[in-house]
């Protein structure tokens, strides 16, 4: 059991018969009444996001998540195959389980596969990935003064807003948490 006062971003807990990951939390001490913790939780099974309020000092069960390093091998229809780097055991996941992460997955990429009590919940990609621009409008000289952006389609199919100086074929650093451009690689 863990106290809600000890919440940290990324902590996994068991609440209401579900496995939840703490995305955000805030300790609130109103002038009148008892303190409480307002939190934003993501269900690791369904991906649903829920806001929940706990009384300060309330105890919740900590979920012990197994985190295995695996390599993304290939996609075949709606099935995506991963391989454990130590045992060479292969694992297949459905598109619905890793829909968001697919925007960042390239073949042979190292990822963390998370599971709870032998049930695979999903995939955790690195915070940043390097992806190549496959389609974008050419930058026109003089456009940079405004500091604007233009859409660019990356090799995984993800479309992000990038500065005007980015061209087709450039490799970019992309933040996987916000699906946004960070810098050139």
From Swiss-Prot:
Alphabetized CDD domains for the sequence: S1_EF-P_repeat_1 (cd04470), S1_EF-P_repeat_2 (cd05794)
GO cellular component: cytoplasm
The protein's annotated pathway: Protein biosynthesis; polypeptide chain elongation
Pfam families: EFP (PF01132), EFP_N (PF08207), Elong-fact-P_C (PF09285)
This protein's UniProt keywords: Cytoplasm, Elongation factor, Protein biosynthesis
GO MF, one example: translation elongation factor activity
UniProt record, GO biological process: peptide biosynthetic process
Main localization, broad class: cytoplasm
Cell location: Cytoplasm
Function description: Involved in peptide bond synthesis. Stimulates efficient translation and peptide-bond synthesis on native or reconstituted 70S ribosomes in vitro. Probably functions indirectly by altering the affinity of the ribosome for aminoacyl-tRNA, thus increasing their reactivity as acceptors for peptidyl transferase.
Sequence similarity: Belongs to the elongation factor P family.
NCBIfam families tied to this protein: efp, PRK00529.1
PANTHER family: ELONGATION FACTOR P, ELONGATION FACTOR P (EF-P) FAMILY PROTEIN
Protein name, per record: Elongation factor P
């Amino acid at each position: 059991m863990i106290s809600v006062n000890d919440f940290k971003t990324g902590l996994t807990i068991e609440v209401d018969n579900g496995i939840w990951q703490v995305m955000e939390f805030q300790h609130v001490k109103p002038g009148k009444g008892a303190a409480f913790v307002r939190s934003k939780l993501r269900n690791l099974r369904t991906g649903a996001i829920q806001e929940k309020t706990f009384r300060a000092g309330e105890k919740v069960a900590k979920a012990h998540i197994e985190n295995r390093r695996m390599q993304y091998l290939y996609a075949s229809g709606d099935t995506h195959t991963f391989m454990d780097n130590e045992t060479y055991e292969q694992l297949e996941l459905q598109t619905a389980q890793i829909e968001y992460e697919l925007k960042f997955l390239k073949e042979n990429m190292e990822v963390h596969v998370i599971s709870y009590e032998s049930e695979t919940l999903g995939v955790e990609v690195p915070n940043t990935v390097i992806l190549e621009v496959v389609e974008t409008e050419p930058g026109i000289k003089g456009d940079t003064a405004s500091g604007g952006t233009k859409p660019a389609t990356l090799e995984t199919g993800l479309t992000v807003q990038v500065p005007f100086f980015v061209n087709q074929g450039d490799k970019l650093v992309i933040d996987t948490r916000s699906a946004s451009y960070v810098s050139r690689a």
